[in-house]
């Protein structure tokens, strides 16, 4: 080889070494940190937790990368009744969008999980089987129809109302005799006298009807694992804790030799090969226990699974060069794939939840028991017409959660 060319190759090689990021040691396997995982799963919410469980079950070495804290670093997430403590803890991050044109240039505030288990570690513990309309049967994608996926949903759960299934996720039912549910039902009947009640619970009714003719209400199942003890022939609940995705899927494999967990580690981008066809490396910004940040990289032998949620997954894709080419180029991001819909069409949650503290208005219908349920046929006519169910919290603390079914017709949402 020409000496000049040899020198240039040497310089390029040296430059690459000098600028290379260190290996993310927390995500490797061998003592010398050269043992790379077979797969990297980004995000430890329900999707990522289930993915890593299946990854280990198939005999692979798998690293789960989570931006937030380890599960037991935030003790409140284990207690079902401690939501108000969770929302003021490090398990939660608060984010705001930029002004959105389709929302009259208003911003949207979002609560994001910042702990292993993702949203399942901080949410309202309601277990809902995805509605049949969300399976996109018109796309005719093999293996993803409602009929094919419903058995998989059922196989994930262990429920008193579906004893034929024993999955890793324990769910608890809400008895029809529960005073809070009775108040809820009475309130609904006052406003919607003809709406059908779905028993023994919403999920079982949905499964029994094959997802057809489903609109209605019923007792919810909750993602709590409850231990019962028999007293005088009756099963009495003794203790209950949150059955998060972490507890159901990750905790049982926590000490498996093929499993690694990186916490406080934010994936900034996915790195593709020169042909822009394969991705086997992620760039990570990690935070140590002293609060100092550093960048590192982690390589997978076979592939990377993005399961960082409805907000952060498209963000990582965009930062990696996958998205609207003109917008990426304007930001100086090298385009890997022009996909115009990435980062758009966000559809993340079936309800709108509003919480506030204040007196109970006199014009509310109410079932007057502890855990009051209130209905107001028009919450604020000057802003938006809607139906609003309100459930008061702990007696003595007038804290109400509002679930709204919005009927929007050219009104500003505030």
From Swiss-Prot:
A molecular function (GO) term: flavin adenine dinucleotide binding
Cross-referenced Gene3D superfamilies: 3.30.410.40, FAD/NAD(P)-binding domain
Residues engaged in binding FAD: 38-67
InterPro entries listed in its UniProt record: FAD/NAD-bd_sf, GMC_OxRdtase, GMC_OxRdtase_N
Cofactor(s) listed in the protein's UniProt record: FAD
Record carries keyword Oxidoreductase: no
Taxonomy, superkingdom: Viruses
Keywords: FAD, Flavoprotein, Signal
Range of residues in the leader sequence: 1-20
Protein's name according to its UniProt entry: Putative truncated GMC-type inactive oxidoreductase R832
Protein species of origin: Acanthamoeba polyphaga mimivirus (APMV)
């Amino acid at each position: 080889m020409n000496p000049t060319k040899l020198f240039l190759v040497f310089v390029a090689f040296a430059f690459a070494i000098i600028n290379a990021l260190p290996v993310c040691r927390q995500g490797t396997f061998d003592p010398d940190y050269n043992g790379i995982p077979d797969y990297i799963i980004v995000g430890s919410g329900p999707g990522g937790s289930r993915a890593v469980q299946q990854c280990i079950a198939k005999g692979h070495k798998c690293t789960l990368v989570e931006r937030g804290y380890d599960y037991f670093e935030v003790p409140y997430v284990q207690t079902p009744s401690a939501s108000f403590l969770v929302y003021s803890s490090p398990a939660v991050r608060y984010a705001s969008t930029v002004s959105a044109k389709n929302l009259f240039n208003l911003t949207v505030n979002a609560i994001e999980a910042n702990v292993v288990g993702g949203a399942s570690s901080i949410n309202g513990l309601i277990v809902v089987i995805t509605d049949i309309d969300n399976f996109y049967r018109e796309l005719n994608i093999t293996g993803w129809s409602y009929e094919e996926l419903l058995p998989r949903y059922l196989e994930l759960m262990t429920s008193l109302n579906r004893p034929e299934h024993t999955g890793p996720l324990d769910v608890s039912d809400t008895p029809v005799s529960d005073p809070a549910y009775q108040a809820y039902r009475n309130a609904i009947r006052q406003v919607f006298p003809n709406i059908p009640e779905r028993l023994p619970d919403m999920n079982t009714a949905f499964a029994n009807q094959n997802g057809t003719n489903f609109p209605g209400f019923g007792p919810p199942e909750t993602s709590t694992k409850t231990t019962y003890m028999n007293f005088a022939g009756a099963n009495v609940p003794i203790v209950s804790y949150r059955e998060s995705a972490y507890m159901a899927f990750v905790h049982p494999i926590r000490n498996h030799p093929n499993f690694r967990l990186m916490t406080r580690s934010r994936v900034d981008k996915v790195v593709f090969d020169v042909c822009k066809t394969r991705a086997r490396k992620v760039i990570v910004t990690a935070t140590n226990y002293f609060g100092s940040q550093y960048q590192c990289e982690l390589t997978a032998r076979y592939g990377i699974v993005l399961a960082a949620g409805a907000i952060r997954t498209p963000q990582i894709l965009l930062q990696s060069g996958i998205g609207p080419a003109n917008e990426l180029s304007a930001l100086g991001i090298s385009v890997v794939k022009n996909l115009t819909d990435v980062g758009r069409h966000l559809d993340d949650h079936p309800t709108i939840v509003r919480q506030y503290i204040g007196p109970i208005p006199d014009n509310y219908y109410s079932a007057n028991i502890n855990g009051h349920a209130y209905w107001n046929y028009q919450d604020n006519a000057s802003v938006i017409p809607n139906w609003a169910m309100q459930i008061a919290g702990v007696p003595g603390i007038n804290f109400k959660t509002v679930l709204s079914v919005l009927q929007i017709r050219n009104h500003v949402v505030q």
